[in-house]
Amino acid sequence: MMSKHPHSPSTPQDETPSVPGRRRFMNSAALAGLATVVACTDKGAPAGSAAATGVAATAEEHTVAGLHPKPGQLDTYYGLWSGGHTGDMRVMGMPSGREIHRIPMFVPDALVGWGITNESKKVMGTRPDGRLKYTVGDTHHVHASYKDGNYDGRYAWINDKINSRLGRVRLDYFICDKITELPNVQGFHGIFPDKRDPVDPQINYTTRVFCGGEFAIPLPNTAGIDDPAKYRSLFTCVDAESMEVRWQVLIDGNCDLVATSYDGKLAATNQYNTEMGAHYEDMMSAERDACLFFNVARIEAAVKAGRFKTIGDSKVPVVDGTHAANQDPKTALTAYVSVPKNPHGVNASPDQKYFICAGKLSPTATVIELARVLDWFDGKLAKIDDAIVAEVELGLGPLHTAFDGRGNAYTTLFLDSQIVKWNIDAAIRFHKGDKNAKYVVDRLDVHYQPGHLNASQSETVAADGKFLAVGCKFSKDRFLPVGPLHPENEQFIDISGDKMVLLQDHPIRSEPHDFIIFKRELLHPKQIYSLDDFPLATKDPKQSGVVRNGKKVTVRLTSQAPSYSLREFKLKKGDEVTLILTNLDKVEDLTHGFAIPKYDINFIVNPQETASVTFIADKPGVFWCYCTHFCHALHLEMRSRMIVEA
């Protein structure tokens, strides 16, 4: 049994004896696996209820299903999805679930030439010899910039967990324009932008991005490598505009996901390894972990006052956020709120009042009132745990929470394969002792084992409670079999009424994690570039040609469907060649490709875009450069001869 705590969880009131056979089987299998893990700690598995409330209504029975766009119609929402270990960001249309675009981020992409062109290599980062520094990535969490509590359409950010990088996407062109590698961090997992400045009321938009380091390491990572007790994690703040690291915080425990308050004063991360264990049994040994809060203004004041250190070769200021250094609330930089065992996920409610931590190994969600956290920092609250206003049971394996803007929360239950809809105010009343407060509103079976979820506009003050997307980690029998590797199952749900309605399944290539959904009118994408955006642009085909400077050769050419400005160009074996291509077409959707056989080169240029590649002409002969991206009825004739003389 879990040990008692002043905020011991309350139990749900909606148990019913009916559990569908498939989910009963999956519950049993999942619980058996959990029991094996928990047995390593000599502690029992947390109790909870997973009963379904009955068969869900079908999409055909529900009017909102008619909002699915017909051919030629546009979706009403954008969705930005992480790609997982494909290392990209994906753009979806909602509510159709149609994948519209993939934005290359941390790994090469042969279609667009990401990691091949000089421009993309500059963003990705290279070694001294010009090779890419990294060729793999693992994107988990995507979030966008804010103004006045809603998305402003400027930027989106996404993490790379493998190599601790933060990537930024310009939402006017849907391209990655900057990547920053975080110093002294491994397992960079959760991210979240701030929503306004904590001090200056005129700065009502995002200026910081907070990043959580999940894996503790020696600091620097060359000293004490055999002593896990000395490993530590860092919480990082990155400047939203320059993408430079502003500061870091040394903490006890680790970081998982990240949330920020709407007033800009607080950031937080849930912690599942306050034990700072190096083995998973140790990571589950404590009955309660923490939601760690950061007082942003105080941290930046400490940095400005010089109360920091640096680590290794990094020049980034690092302040002390450990328990020992933050005993006095009136000077503390951090506050550790106790939450049940191994939480997974912390989310900010759109009414700006609460952060909610889901329990994972506890069947509970913990509601933390932000005003009380600020009271503790001001010395007005006796104990930081008094900021907890509810801790209620939801079901087995709660992970992540979304909101509908009507006071309801939606939490994924991994072991139960369910979404539970619950009312926050009712949960608070129930926690205070009102046993008539029915906080569980509805349950819906999903297929199967849901991880992340998000609702339309959920993480803004404009949460509209229309659609919910759920990322199910296992698709099992939902799609045609294609061999051992299954797709993920993204399920879309109508949440506009009292009951949740499952609308559709979508197979998606492994392995997305988090995502956001927002109204399309918040974005104003440009579909044709400006020539002036590119310093290397060749603005007139007459400027095309070959310029030699010793062994270094520059080839300039333009493209206008269906031809390149140079029908052929000559090089000598051993030349270092920089080829610059400008697309002079001004027609939307008229993208050109450029491939050089046997030279491992392919890239595209969109209308009015310029891109370049550099390579060694090490193979003599004739090589037909051709357009790989269909652009004209004479597409196959769009070629140029590269002649390399021996």
Curated annotation (Swiss-Prot):
Residues 1-52 form the signal peptide. Gene3D superfamilies: Cupredoxins - blue copper proteins, YVTN repeat-like/Quinoprotein amine dehydrogenase. It comes from the Bacteria. Cu cation Z4 binds at H513. Cu cation A2 binds at C627, H629, C631, H635. Cu cation A1 binds at H592, C627, C631, M638. Its EC number is 1.7.2.4. This is Nitrous-oxide reductase. It comes from Ralstonia nicotianae (strain ATCC BAA-1114 / GMI1000). The lineage of its organism: Bacteria, Pseudomonadati, Pseudomonadota, Betaproteobacteria, Burkholderiales. The gene is nosZ.
